[in-house]
Amino acid sequence: VPIAGLTSKKYADELRKGISLDAVGSKIPAGNPLPFGSGGTSHLSVIDKNGNIVALTQTINYFFGSGVLVPGTGILLNNEMDDLNPKPGTSNSIEPKKRPLSSMSPTIMLKDGKPFLSVGSPGATRIITALTQIIVNVVDFRMNIQDAIDSPRIHCMTDTIFMESSIPKDVQAALAAKGHKLTVRGPVDLYFGGAQAV
């Protein structure tokens, strides 16, 4: 049961579009809550009082993984193998003894040889760009970790720049004027990762 999707305000907003207060409605088709869920990747960061540090990103890949439960254990197997490319001849093609490409990037940073930051995020291929922006915000712009995580993000791996709508309008206009294709998403959008850090 996709609880996160079913209880999502965005999913409720989608369903609400089919309801009219001005006329008798027709039959409303069942919705699809899966796109409104949080997926199957999570991250946690921990530092204890002794300075021991953990950055852990885990995934079952997408929602219920492979859909296979190990009998008697409650353990759900992932479907990470679908991250391999079915086309032969690429660096990520299906082959024996091969692990699929993954963007998971649990990160521990040291300063003067001591733990200084543990950070990671879900978000598929957007994990790398999300973490890069967060780390640059902390290291180069000297933001505290919460401000670094809360700052608006972009993602660009194709000819389109995806960005949160909270990127300043003048920046959006300048990028468009240079010929970039822009896709603007919500102001705080989990599409760009849901980073967690200490």
Functional labels for PLM-detected ranges:
Residues 1-59, 72-73, 80, 186:
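Internal maturation/activation junctions in enzymes
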Residues 23-32, 85-94, 179-182:
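Short Pro/Gly-enriched beta-strand edge/turn motifs at strand-loop
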Residues 52-117, 141, 145:
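Active-site rim segments in enzyme catalytic domains, especially the processed small/beta chain
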Residues 121-143:
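Alpha-helical support elements that line or immediately flank enzyme active sites
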Residues 1-29, 137, 141, 145, ...:
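N-terminal leader/propeptide and maturation segments of large enzyme subunits in energy/redox metabolism
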Residues 33-37, 95-101, 186-190:
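Short Gly/Pro-enriched turn/cap motifs at secondary-structure boundaries
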Residues 42-46, 106-108, 194-198:
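Short beta-strand scaffold segments in enzyme catalytic cores
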Residues 145-155:
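Short, well-structured alpha-helical segments that form the helix of a local strand-helix-strand
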